Amino acid sequence: MMHRIDPSKLELEERVVTINRVAKVVKGGRRFRFAALVVVGDKNGHVGFGTGKAQEVPDAIRKAIEDAKKNLIAVPLVGTTIPHTINGHFGAGEVFLKPAAEGTGVIAGGPVRAVLELAGVQDILSKSLGSNTPINMIRATVNGLSELKRAEDVAKLRGKSVEELLG
């Protein structure tokens, strides 16, 4: 991530992925709180995720949205899909992302689908490998999306034209 993306300039849509009741065991019993996992995106190449924890669900969601807006990344899109195949990793979670032909749709499960749809990807094939914990799947997906590069960018780095690069 080179520079921070200003969330106030984007029309962000948010999606709650999971809400989890967590407990802290104290002498008098259990203290319950809620942990929320939220994905935000503008469906035009920007996406972020965040977590929030509070005593009430709406507060946890609000905190998660604020956190997600601080963690926005830019996703390079080629038409309605991604530039190339990539594997995203986080912990024991791994997500395989592969570009798809127009009209394929988003073939992804649960948390991965939320990230891809809000990033603006309309055609993609994906497979979740390893850990299926929502937070790990989202982090692995965001990791994969952040490592994507356009052919023009790679050609510029190597000092070649796109035609030379693609052969």
From Swiss-Prot:
GO BP annotations, alphabetical order: translation
Gene3D superfamilies recorded: 3.30.160.20, 3.30.230.10
InterPro entries linked to this entry: Ribosomal_Su5_D2-typ_SF, Ribosomal_uS5, Ribosomal_uS5_bac-type, Ribosomal_uS5_C, Ribosomal_uS5_N, Ribosomal_uS5_N_CS, Ribsml_uS5_D2-typ_fold_subgr
Cited Pfam families: Ribosomal_S5 (PF00333), Ribosomal_S5_C (PF03719)
Domain S5 DRBM: start-end pairs: 12-75
GO function term, MF aspect, one: rRNA binding
GO CC annotations, alphabetized: cytosolic small ribosomal subunit
Keywords: Ribonucleoprotein, Ribosomal protein, RNA-binding, rRNA-binding
Function noted in UniProt: With S4 and S12 plays an important role in translational accuracy. Located at the back of the 30S subunit body where it stabilizes the conformation of the head with respect to the body.
Family membership noted in the UniProt record: Belongs to the universal ribosomal protein uS5 family.
Assembly information from the UniProt record: Part of the 30S ribosomal subunit. Contacts proteins S4 and S8.
Description of its domains: The N-terminal domain interacts with the head of the 30S subunit; the C-terminal domain interacts with the body and contacts protein S4. The interaction surface between S4 and S5 is involved in control of translational fidelity.
Protein name: Small ribosomal subunit protein uS5
